[in-house]
Amino acid sequence: MRYDPSLIEKKWQQFWKEHKSFKADETADKPKYYVLDMFPYPSGAGLHVGHLIGYTATDIVARYKRAKGFSVLHPMGWDSFGLPAEQYAVRTGTHPRETTKKNIENFRKQLSAMGFSYDEAREFATSDPEYYRWTQKLFLFLYEKGLAYMADMAVNYCEELGTVLANEEVENGLSIEGGYPVERRMLRQWILRITAYADQLLQGLEDLDWPENVKQLQRNWIGKSEGALLRFVVDKDKCLEVFTTRPDTLCGVSFLVMAPEHPEIQQLVSEEQRSAVESYIRCAQSKSERERISETKVKSGVFTGAYAKHAITGAALPIWVSDYVIMGYGSGVVMGVPAHDERDREFANAFALPIDEVLDENEHCINSNHGDFLLNGLQGKEASDYVIAYLQKRNLGEAKVMYKLHDWLFSRQRYWGEPIPIIHFEDGTCRPLEDDELPLLPPEIQDYRPKGFGQGPLAKVKEWVDIHDVKTQRPGRRETHTMPQWAGSCWYYLRFCDAHNSQAPWSHENERYWMPVDLYIGGAEHAVLHLLYSRFWHRVFYEAGLVSTPEPFKKLINQGLVLATSYRIPGKGYVHPEDAREDNGKWTTASGEELEVRQEKMSKSKLNGVDPQILIDEFGADALRMYAMFSGPLDKNKLWCNQGVSGCRRFLNRFYELATSSAVQDIDDPKGMALAHRLVHKVGEDIEKMSLNTIPSSFMEFINEFAKLDTYSKSALSMVVRALAPIAPHISEELWTVLGYAPGIDNAGWPEVDPKYLEDTSVTFVIQVNGKLRARLDMDKNTSQEDILSAARESVAKYLEDKEIKKEVFVPNRLVNFVL
């Protein structure tokens, strides 16, 4: 029979849909398994094959676990709020809702063509009002807990995007979205108090089965530092607080430096220096954080005209303002120890400030005894503990743990996001909306551009913003900021547990059944964004008794990048691969322009993405699924090669022909069964270990050996087909029915492996003629002596031709010698 995936795959996809084959049930008598992909943002570009690596891996695990008797939750949804749809709306006037709907339809079609076994009934988008009603409700829960608040703060403002960005959305002074310049400005914002959970988030990492590099990224981002909070007296009513991890260097302090955003600068600055300080602050506000902290930047600063008293020496320490100090970590003030800190030394050299050595080459304290303060000779922690104890007695300092982590800047000046469900009143108070007022929908608008700095598009809709509040009978003003894209993805995994609940975001019963997520697969780029934010929300819910587990994701795997060849005209941009020409090892365009050829991450911008539908049309989804795994270990970068899909298609052709041939018989064949049992055992082990890249080659090795048999055991093939089903489900379903079984191969269960077949029963015989080695012969050790001698004669037939065998020497499991 001929293998035609175009017919087979559509047939079985329709069967699964009609029979709701992948519907997840909360079945008490079954163990559960929750396997989840980081759900995608439905962009206009659609999916390329690089996106399918992780999705294929989770689908293999989901199908395997169903076959093993688990109740499996394997859902898919859409992280559909976000900036690209809004930017498209600004350019075209098309409502983001319409763009998003169209993109989701395309994504759904692409995923369906791959045969992924999602529970379609649980699908939702974060932009569905039925979903973000609960996102708004959960935000209000955080507000009631004191974890959501408003404050004036220095923010990352991107003029090109027209919105404020969280620290996690800025890299090297540029927006991660689009790579636009970001500057610091003061703005009143909604903020989530993630720092209140810094220690819990840090400790919780220890028990997670996550890649160590992701855990380390979160540790570094949280940035726990143990040190001291020191107070430097400015006058009798005012102190400046400084956090330091090196209190042992206190006697080397010769100046203090404040961040330009520090709120107390205006109270400290002298009238003579006020104009210069204010000018410097304005200049600093126009710089990105990357510019300010650059190691190659010449240090700048301005003297405030004020001094602080050194806690030990009593010296007057000049107080400066410099943009190399960033507000938000520590207290926004640093103590200048130029002899032992490179940045401080550069600053001291720039402004001719004293440099006092207080540590020797072995880090022992020197030049640090003053009166009853005796620090000389002490080292490291002992020295720091002495300083802290001395200052604490005088109310000038204490031990302090600080975190690099900032509270999460939560509001955005955008349209396409969840409206924040708060009403503000003229007296400065505000009211959270009640349950019967949710969801709060955004108004329909024509102009999606921000109104100006600090005001999103919603601020322009006066009839929506300015209201008469029916609950209080007072005039009020709706909040015009929206939530960030991360809000909906902070808790979506919980909604999948109970996607149709209209009374609550999830029920306790369903949450207790499904949580935590057993396997979570997605990109490492979310290490300090989505993964940290969702852990924070989950910790809050856990403390409140809303969820049963302290952590949401038990095991995490980051799939590696998929690389593909890109072609670029230097200084101009990328060209499509079909426009590239090779001539004597050089690549050019059709017009002769020289090209740079690289192996880069597959992406739309580099024009090197591969549309999976093209490969499905040519080779079939099962072949594409097999190659997606065969291309390399799941967590490693891999180079995509379309020819590899062709090789997997050839294997499937061969397997289909073998399984549908007349040689398939209902017989008991020990050799065929042994091959099948060993394959099933190997495939099961590889799935459990997530060594999915070795599975295709195991099947190829199997068929090479199995095809040598004269007849093919139906029982052996039924095992192999069931083992193939997780990775190539369409052909497996088809062959399962061809072999005479009822449709629905997942329901047939995973084949039971008999340990007796796993023993190595092969024996290598040395075949000699007159004592000379002429051949080697692999035989099953249970083969009869007569059959072994027959096979041995055949293996050395050319040496026996026209000769009389005088004697046959047979040594069991070792040797056959023909004496002529």
From Swiss-Prot:
Pfam families: Anticodon_1 (PF08264), tRNA-synt_1 (PF00133), tRNA-synt_1_2 (PF13603), tRNA-synt_1g (PF09334). Gene3D superfamilies: HUPs, Isoleucyl-tRNA Synthetase, Domain 1. GO terms for cellular component: cytosol. A motif ('HIGH' region) lies at residues 40-51. GO terms for molecular function: aminoacyl-tRNA deacylase activity; ATP binding; leucine-tRNA ligase activity. Keywords: Aminoacyl-tRNA synthetase, ATP-binding, Cytoplasm, Ligase, Nucleotide-binding, Protein biosynthesis. A motif ('KMSKS' region) lies at residues 601-605. ATP binds at K604. The keyword Cytoplasm applies. It is an enzyme of class 6 (ligase). PANTHER family: LEUCINE--TRNA LIGASE, MITOCHONDRIAL (PTHR43740:SF2), LEUCYL-TRNA SYNTHETASE (PTHR43740). This is Leucine--tRNA ligase. The lineage of its organism: Bacteria, Pseudomonadati, Chlamydiota, Chlamydiia, Chlamydiales.
